[in-house]
Amino acid sequence: MKTEEILIKGAKLHNLKNITVGIPRNKLVVITGLSGSGKSSLAFDTLYAEGQRRYVESLSSYARQFLGKLDKPKVDNIVGIAPAIAIQQKVNTSNPRSTVGTSTEVYDYLKLLFARIGKTYSPISGQEVKKHTVTDVVDAVMRYPEGTKLLLLAPVSIPKDRTVEQVLKLLLQQGYARILYKEEIIRLEEDNLPKNLDNFQLVVDRVIVRHDEDFQHRLADAVDTAFFEGKGECYIQEMDGVVQTHFSNRFELDGITFLEPNVHLFSFNNPYGACPKCDGYGDTIGLDEDLIVPNTGLSVYENAIYPWRGETMSWFRDQLVNNAYKFDFPIHKPWFELTDEQKQLVWDGNKYFTGLTDFFKELEDKSYKIQNRVLLARYRGKTRCHECHGKRLRKEANYVKIAGKSISDLVELPIEELQIFFKELKLTDYEQEVAKRLLLEINNRLQFLADVGLGYLTLNRKSNTLSGGESQRINLATSLGSSLVGSMYILDEPSIGLHPRDTERLIGVLKSLRDLGNTVIVVEHDEDIMKAADYIIDIGPEAGTHGGEVVAAGTYEELLKADTLTGKYLSGRLAIEVPKKRRTSPQYITLVGCRENNLKNIDVTFPLDMLTVVTGVSGSGKSTLVKKLLYPAIQKELDLGGEKIGQFTKIEGKYKHLQSVEFVDQNPIGKSTRSNPITYIKAYDDIRTLFANQKLAKMRNFQSKHFSFNVDGGRCEVCKGEGEVTIEMQFMADVHLTCEACGGKRFKKEVLEVMYEGKNIDDLLNTTIDDAVAFFQKHKQTKIAEKLKPLQDVGLGYVTLGQSSSTLSGGEAQRIKLASFLSKSDSKEKVLFIFDEPTTGLHFHDIRKLLDSLQALIEKGHSVIIIEHNTEMIKSADYVIDLGLEGGAKGGNLVATGTPEEIAKNKQSYTGKYLKLK
């Protein structure tokens, strides 16, 4: 029975209030609502979990033991559920071998393509390497006119331990009667064998060409014999001519024997194809060019090469500078403008100067001197493998080409350019037949990657360097590539990290997934995606304990009329106001000559003491500018140590009033189930002390540690403060039972008897932050209330004090970090805060609260810089830096800077176009 909808009955997981809701089948459905209202609980923890569980239940018990054990979610029943696929916004892999190409399977098809139709070219002459088969020789013979007399010859080599006479005797015994020597045929006779011959050929057969099948069969046998006797070589020559045609069944040219292409030759995960030096990683521990030339804006003359500074070592630099004119080396050109060949020359050296490679080798040879060991250690780091130059494959793999390009050349092209390469690829009919299916798969997958807005990535980009939004969209493209039908796709905010311009393409992808015959369910706050949805479910009305109900369900038009927060913001009845005036400030930081990744040597000024937003389409260079240049550069300026800094020339500006810089990302605040928001913001210590000071606690000699579930003392000994006991059931889901000893309250009975104003420690941990703030204010515990207040300000009032950090979303984790800074910010320190997409997972109403918190930080004298795509956030900024124009190689330029009003007037800026609509 196939129902028209998926019906969820009585969902009660987390804060869901026993809800029943129908989701139309084969439609694009958006689940929206405030952060913490229960959207993910419904979509992932109920619907997806049940879909997965039913699939696993259908397998044999033998297969089940190898799979994760799945709990049954708290729901009465789900009718009409389909197989479920969840695509979440986590960077899934930390494996350094995984690349965009391998995770989307495009690379697997490329390997096959090169193995099937790639041609091998000699690096010496550039000629194609071919090996001949018996058929090639037969075809060559058949091209002669009927009746032509030919000789089939095989070259003979004399082994070291034999004489010419012995070899000829052996040939005679094998039934051969003639040899060709110096263009004349000599007949072999037992008693009169020639003694001192060099370079002669054996006549394997004399043939008269006939164009019939019998002749071809006889000839093929003879050619086989000729190849055997000639150790892979043979010749044909007309009986009365002197010109010979050479054939070889060995894969060689220019004195090199080449490897025949097969799939493993192109795999860097296979020992056969991987570069032997770096094992296919592309980088090794060695001399790090970024440490040797830390400032690429300097020229060799200006001491760009750090190890060659100072009195002792400057001799090496002087050698190069004084002799540079002899080999035309530009010593006054900045390092970043040098060609790859010129940089390689500095490494390799020549007869006029010692290169860096030999310079460091000398140091290694004399490493018994302590100063040499120190110098070597200073310039060591992870660096590109010098053997394969980061291409990961053994050099033989790059001799194989299609249309002049090796597989390494192709994976270094942005996906958009790769698509053009395959569109313009000219193949012979035979190659077309062999490669037809492979090309179809490659082109489809590349198209999907372009459709989800990732056309700027290259296939050799490592998976662990992608942002959460990028890796989610790669998973989405991979799912599209597999073209499943009749499934249920559940996506967690696919618009994260996407500029509004790219969201339109994403909507196209979601619709094509739906049109294949799938139900696409998206947890989303983006207005454009809601407009495109067939059906919207709004969960609310508020968050936490005040949420968990379906407050509206229907089309976009129906939602506009609904009396819910989502409806009010969408219809304009509620709105995030544009600030009355924009701040200005004399303090600023300027980065001069930014050229890391795709940045085009730009100068960028970040004003301080205000809200600055960095925008631009996906892949335009925002993260590079802020995460790889600004953040580590300021850390270094303030002597805070820090990460490796990307490439730029210098830092200028008025920023000496800053005492520190904080990068607030979306990584979880704690993996342990015992970690919770109040331990992170250091409020739990005060609460434990408060309980330890109660009369009963003093009588029982309890200290504050007795009120912690992380150390022995007061916590329940049976469940170790977890509140539940896990029983492993071999083939079924682990059963989580409430601990019988403490009844799920985590503490010993005698600890729970200690009360403060009618609440014990367990009651308090189950109180929401909103209620706890009111409770502590009422009982004059203002210190604790003040510490909890920032959590309320950032919109986390719905979270309970003891909620496990492992259940928080990325957006919630980021806001807890923000709250911890807000609670600390009474100090006189001036801090620069950098946020990476803080609106992730936020409803319009939550964005409003977040903006208030950020404005509060700025009012306290701090500076805030944000990477953001959300137009509500951008329009509230004091200053906007827009990068572009496109992503990848076409990005990295400064398109516009100024107030949001100035950006909106800029004709070139994509961001401006979407700001106008606001």
Please name every model-derived segment:
Residues 1-918:
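Conserved phosphate-binding elements of NTP-dependent enzyme cores
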